[in-house]
Design a protein with these regions (language model features):
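Short, flexible helix-loop junctions that flank or precede catalytic/ligand sites
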Residues: 1-226
Length: 226
């Protein structure tokens, strides 16, 4: 297979390496021999990478190295265990990273949930109770002209569940100057979410609801996952 970005040096440290990707140097973390994410990241930095992917930031040491690498010009991608995109900021600070370092290095945080997809073989229309329909239409302009809403009935193709496959719903936080200032001043998650809401940035629930309105998933699944 041809490399995805032939002119760039892309290096990862993963635990484990699940897929081999052409053109990317992939390092498997092995904590039992001392090759954890932090040590793997140190080794990567000696290879003059353009892009670094760290499988997961689990501790201060890994977070500190990753953030300092990003401040020297490398693009750094990683994952954190948080409930939403704003929670990534709090998680890094709680690990011990100085807020000013988080604000100066973080460019974007993206939260993801998986929704069950309605089975296409038993997809059927159903009626939403009037008050709930009015609430949805008042909150989501996309629903105002929609007259058909769907769910899965259950069939042999989906083992009677009404669902077949999954789809991702995302919440993306693009860090602007206002958010950087809020992070540096250690403003609360609630303050940041309030600012994003005023900007019209949609959260996980909003984006999941759009998947329901457009017929991809069920209302029950929206409430379950978000």
């Amino acid at each position: 297979a041809l490399p995805i970005f032939p002119a760039r040096n892309l290096v990862t440290v993963e635990d484990p390496v699940e897929y081999q990707v052409a053109g990317i140097t992939q390092i498997a973390a092995k904590p039992e021999i001392g090759l954890d994410f932090a040590n793997g990241l140190r080794a990567i930095l000696r290879q003059s990478p353009d892009v670094i992917m760290v499988g997961e930031i689990r501790d201060f040491e890994t977070a500190d190295i990753a953030i300092k690498a990003s401040l020297t010009g490398q693009m750094v991608l990683s994952t954190l265990h948080t409930n939403d995109s704003v929670g990534a900021i709090t998680r890094l600070v709680n690990m011990g990273v100085e807020p000013f370092l988080v604000s100066s290095s973080l460019v974007m945080a993206c939260a993801q949930r998986l929704l069950k997809r309605i089975c296409p073989n038993c997809k059927e229309e159903f009626d939403i109770p009037g008050p709930l329909l009015e609430k949805i239409r008042s909150e989501y302009p996309e629903a105002r002209d929609v007259t058909k809403f769907y769910r899965g009935r259950g069939c042999a193709h989906c083992s009677g569940t009404g669902y077949r496959g999954r789809l991702a719903v995302l919440e993306t936080l693009l860090v602007d100057d206002e958010i950087r200032d809020m992070v540096t001043k250690q403003r609360s998650e609630l303050d940041i979410r309030s600012y994003l809401q005023k900007k019209g940035v949609r959260n996980l629930r909003d984006n999941a609801m759009i998947k329901f309105i457009t017929g991809w998933t069920s209302l029950e699944e929206v409430y379950r996952a978000t």
